[in-house]
Each structure stands twice: as structure tokens, then as C-alpha cells.
């Protein structure tokens, strides 16, 4: 999905970027403001987090895609004079709190509960040493597939290599200050046992949630009870990790993170992360809080519930770019992430792409495709919308691409799978989407007397048109039929002749009776693509009671 690494810095673009209100520019301007009056650091660090207790999912894609858009906007605003890096950080030292549902041989993982994910055996087979190693590899493969420019980081490696040692020692020195931030956020029971330090048990290898008996900042050790045995442990070298809220702030301070976005579920904790970062001598990064996705019933999507849409499912029915567009649009608005949003996202993507060459720079920088493709959107001609392909599959009962291409090639001269490979890909997506989501819900209904008369009149009107009539001619003929029928007259609209306009109920009736669906694209466009003769045959089938 990512575009070229070369950035266009022409003067018109730069002037438009300085004024742009597109959200990636708004976020990038915050980072620039952060260093106003001073020098930028050697590298501006963008970070995203990953919890390897599960495989990478659609939220992972969204976070990396959106952060990449902000990073690109920053590069443009600074004329690419400041180095940037996107760090994808895996929290693979977290304890395995529960066994995921989607792993083979769950019982074999029971003895490893609460061990760091990087110490849990890999249940998937292959060459990966641990559960986290496998999922981290899946993350990198996932990000590489989409062409993201990033650097992977492992919490286990950072802790064990000593990258966090200085901050851990500072956390011991400032233990009381950290506790003063954390305790008010906890209930009375948790307050009594809470510690920001989580030792890895030398006995069991588990991540221990135990109270501290003593924190020795000078020696850099903590003392606690491990299954009844008083134990003193060095806090450096990966023997101890921090609880997740202090860990967030510590990481920001240790690495000098400049920008991190997270879901709304983190919003109340952001102030805690910031304060911990400040206590440890760091400067909290700029935040961007995005809204969470909802399922078809408006419920929050949960990995454990599996009530959302996986990235593989989306990409079964639509190109990657449609998902990129969905991530760009309205990130601060709760949106439904379910199968029925896919067709619109596909058509909107190609509409934005088609508009791009005609736009000036101000409009281009407000066009999602500029952000999705790092300022270099491809030139793709998409002569048939996805929604129209779906109706064509529905009317023709096509089971393979060849049938659909028969209609497309007849309607649009010179368009073939070779000349338009993106359309060919979309044809395959449309067949799969129709088979899985439209066909099972298709319900034809019989026409009543008024509707039968309307369909007979429509059949006659189509019969008066040439066999190769275009969409506009068919649409006008259809409207002329509807204007003469009282049920379909809309007196709030006006026809070109000054009479009443046409109610949307007319075209809804056509789709319900002929296609078995509640709605569809512009009827004239559909009939032109399907064919005048074929559309008339469909009307005759409906009138003969062969559909309902």
C-alpha cells in the first residue's frame, strides 16, 4: 500500500501542505510545534505497539498505516530534512495471562501460563523458538506484505540486552513518585499489593504480581516473596519488567518517542503514561487517540470474542487499498467494521483515485489516496464500480470471471483482463463477496398489479431502445415510465417537463422484484452493462413468476 520513498517537494505542494487541514498534517504539525524554537533531534521517532498474545489483526494494520501517514506528512512539512523512524514494538515479555482460543493443543500450554510470551513454547510448529517469536515473525511478514517502512523491536531483547537498565535503575530511585501516581488509580485491594516492578521468578519462570518487601535503589535490587521464599533480584538484565502502565511511560522516556497513537480504551491512562515518562526524565510524546471499531451490532470489537472482521477476511473480498481508505477516513469516529462496509469502501477508493489527476494541490492533500500512497497514487482506470459488478453477478448468477467479462467486454470496448488487471481482480472479489454475503440473503418478491403494469411498461420502453443503448438513455426511459404512474410520482421533485419527479420507491421495486435485493446502483448503468435484451428477459421471468 505504501508508495515510493521519494518525496515530491514542489513549491505548490509545500504551500498547500502548510495550510492543509487533513488530519495527518494536523498531527505532524504538533510534532513540529514540539521542537519550536529549538533543534530537532537526530531522528524523530514514531512508535506503534503490538501485543503478541494474538496474531496481527486489522487494528495492527490500522495503527501502522495511520502512523505512516503522519510520518509522511511530517517529512513533507520538514522538506525531508529530518530523519524519521517508525518503531513497531512488541510487548513480548508480558506474561501469558490466558491461553488463546486459536492455538493447537491448548493443554500443552497450561504449564506455561504467566510466563513471558517469549518463554512460552511455540505451539504452531516450524522454526520459531517461542510463542512470541512465531507471532513476531507473523507481524513482520504482515507489515512487509503491505510495504510498510518500519523497524521491529522486541521488549524481551530490549530488557535482556540492557537497553532499559538505566531507566529501571531510575525507576527504583523514583519508586515513591511512581507509586504516588499509580496508587490513586487502583482500588483498595490492589493498592495493598501493587508494585510497578514485576520480577520473573527464578523458580518458575513466571511473571510475578507480588508486593515489594524492599526496593534498594543503590544496589539496583528488589526483595519479594516467591512462593514463600524471600528473594532478592537485580532489576537489570531482563530479570524484572515493569507493569504495563509504567512500562509505557518508561519506554517513551528510554527511547525518546515523539509520536504514538492508541485506541480510545487507553485514553484515561494516557495521563498516567505521561506522568511516569516525566518522572523518569523523559518528555511524553504527542498522542493521537483513535476511536475503536464496532461490530455489526454496534458492540466493541474484541480479539477474544472474535466478533469483528479479520484482515484476511477483508482482503478476500476487496483490495488492500479499500482497507487503507477505511483506516484514513474519520479515525476519531466510531465506525462499524463489518462485511457490509466493504463495497462502499472499494467504490470510494476508486472514485478518489479517479479524481486525483484533476485536482489542484489543496484538493490533492485532502484526498485520502495522496496519504495512502505516500504522495504517489497510481493511475488506475476503473470503468465498472464494485457495486455494479455485484448486481451483475446477482442478475447473471455468474460463477466465474469469464461470464462477467463477457458482459463487461461487450459494454466497454477495449477493456479486457489484460488491459485492466485491477478490474479483473475486482471481478474475482465481487464473485466471492456475492456468494458469501449477497446470495444467502437474496429474497425475491412477486410484483403487485401496479408493479406488474410498471414492469410491462418498462419492458416496452426498453424494447424501443437500440440493443447497445447507453446507461443514460436507459435511465431516462425508465424515469419516463415511472412519471406516468401515480404511485411513483414524487411531487417534491420536478421533471424536466415541469411535472412531478420520480420516487426512489420505483427503483427499489425493480431491485426487489428483479434482483432480490433491497437496493442497487443506478439502474440505467446496470441495465446497460447487463444488456437491454437480458434485462427484458429478466422482467419477463419476474412477470411469469419464475423468480419469486
Curated annotation (Swiss-Prot):
A motif ('KMSKS' region) lies at residues 300-304. It is found in: Cytoplasm. GO terms for cellular component: cytoplasm. Keywords: Aminoacyl-tRNA synthetase, ATP-binding, Cytoplasm, Ligase, Nucleotide-binding, Protein biosynthesis. Its EC number is 6.1.1.6. One of its GO terms (molecular function) is ATP binding. ATP binds at residue 303. One of its GO terms (biological process) is lysyl-tRNA aminoacylation. It catalyses: tRNA(Lys) + L-lysine + ATP = L-lysyl-tRNA(Lys) + AMP + diphosphate. InterPro entries: aa-tRNA-synth_I_codon-bd_sub2, aa-tRNA-synth_I_CS, aa_tRNA-synth_I_cd-bd_sf, Lys-tRNA-ligase, Rossmann-like_a/b/a_fold. It is an enzyme of class 6 (ligase). This is Lysine--tRNA ligase. It comes from Mesorhizobium japonicum (strain LMG 29417 / CECT 9101 / MAFF 303099) (Mesorhizobium loti (strain MAFF 303099)).
Amino acid at each position: 500500500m505504501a508508495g515510493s520513498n521519494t518525496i515530491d517537494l514542489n513549491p505548490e505542494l509545500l504551500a498547500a501542505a502548510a495550510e492543509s487541514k487533513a488530519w495527518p498534517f494536523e498531527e505532524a504539525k504538533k510534532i513540529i510545534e514540539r521542537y519550536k524554537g529549538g533543534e530537532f533531534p537526530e531522528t524523530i521517532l514514531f512508535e506503534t505497539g503490538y501485543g503478541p498474545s494474538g496474531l496481527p489483526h486489522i487494528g495492527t494494520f490500522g495503527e501502522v498505516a495511520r502512523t505512516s501517514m503522519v510520518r509522511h506528512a511530517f517529512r513533507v512539512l520538514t522538506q525531508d530534512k529530518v530523519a524519521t523512524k517508525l518503531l513497531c514494538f512488541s510487548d513480548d515479555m508480558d506474561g501469558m495471562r490466558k491461553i488463546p482460543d486459536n492455538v493447537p493443543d491448548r493443554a500443552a500450554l497450561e504449564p506455561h501460563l504467566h510466563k513471558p510470551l517469549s518463554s512460552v513454547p511455540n505451539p504452531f510448529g516450524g522454526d520459531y523458538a517461542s510463542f512470541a517469536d512465531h507471532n513476531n515473525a507473523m507481524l513482520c511478514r504482515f507489515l512487509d506484505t503491505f510495504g510498510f517502512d518500519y523497524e521491529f523491536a522486541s521488549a524481551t531483547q530490549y530488557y535482556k540486552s540492557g537497553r532499559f537498565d538505566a531507566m529501571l535503575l531510575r525507576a527504583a530511585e523514583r519508586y515513591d513518585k511512581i507509586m504516588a501516581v499509580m496508587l490513586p488509580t487502583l482500588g483498595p485491594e490492589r493498592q495493598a499489593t501493587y508494585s510497578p516492578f514485576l520480577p520473573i521468578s527464578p523458580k518458575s519462570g513466571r511473571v510475578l504480581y507480588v508486593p515489594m518487601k524492599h526496593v534498594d535503589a543503590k544496589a539496583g535490587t528488589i526483595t519479594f516473596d516467591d512462593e514463600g521464599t524471600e528473594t532478592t533480584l537485580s532489576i537489570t538484565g531482563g530479570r524484572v519488567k515493569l507493569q504495563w502502565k509504567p512500562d509505557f511511560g518508561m519506554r517513551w522516556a528510554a527511547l525518546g518517542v515523539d509520536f504514538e497513537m492508541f485506541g480510545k480504551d487507553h485514553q484515561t491512562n494516557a495521563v498516567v503514561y505521561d506522568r511516569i515518562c516525566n518522572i523518569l526524565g523523559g518528555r511524553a510524546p504527542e498522542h493521537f487517540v483513535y476511536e475503536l471499531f464496532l461490530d455489526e451490532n454496534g458492540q466493541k470489537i474484541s480479539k477474544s470474542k472474535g466478533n469483528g472482521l479479520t484482515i484476511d477476511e477483508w482482503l478476500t473480498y476487496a483490495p488492500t487499498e479499500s482497507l487503507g481508505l477505511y483506516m484514513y477516513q474519520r479515525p476519531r469516529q466510531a465506525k462499524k467494521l463489518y462485511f457490509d462496509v466493504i463495497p462502499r469502501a472499494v467504490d470510494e477508493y476508486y472514485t478518489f483515485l479517479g479524481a486525483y489527476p484533476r485536482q489542484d494541490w489543496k484538493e490533492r492533500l485532502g484526498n485520502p489516496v495522496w496519504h495512502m500512497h505516500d504522495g504517489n497514487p497510481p493511475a488506475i482506470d476503473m470503468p465498472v464500480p464494485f457495486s455494479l459488478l455485484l448486481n451483475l453477478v446477482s442478475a447473471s448468477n455468474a460463477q466465474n470471471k469469464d461470464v462477467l467479462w463477457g458482459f463487461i467486454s461487450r459494454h466497454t470496448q477495449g477493456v479486457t483482463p489484460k488491459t485492466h488487471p485491477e478490474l479483473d481482480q475486482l471481478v474475482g472479489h465481487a464473485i466471492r463477496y456475492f456468494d458469501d454475503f449477497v446470495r444467502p440473503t437474496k429474497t425475491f418478491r412477486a410484483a403487485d398489479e401496479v408493479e406488474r403494469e410498471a414492469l410491462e411498461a418498462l419492458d416496452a420502453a426498453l424494447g424501443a431502445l437500440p440493443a447497445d443503448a447507453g446507461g443514460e438513455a436507459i435511465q431516462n426511459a425508465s424515469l419516463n415510465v415511472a412519471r406516468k404512474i401515480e404511485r411513483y410520482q414524487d411531487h417534491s421533485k420536478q421533471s424536466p417537463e415541469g411535472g412531478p419527479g420520480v420516487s426512489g420507491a420505483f427503483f427499489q421495486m425493480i431491485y426487489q422484484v428483479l434482483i432480490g435485493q433491497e437496493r442497487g446502483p443506478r439502474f440505467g448503468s446496470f441495465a446497460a452493462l447487463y444488456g437491454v435484451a437480458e434485462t427484458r428477459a429478466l422482467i419477463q421471468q419476474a412477470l411469469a413468476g419464475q423468480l419469486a
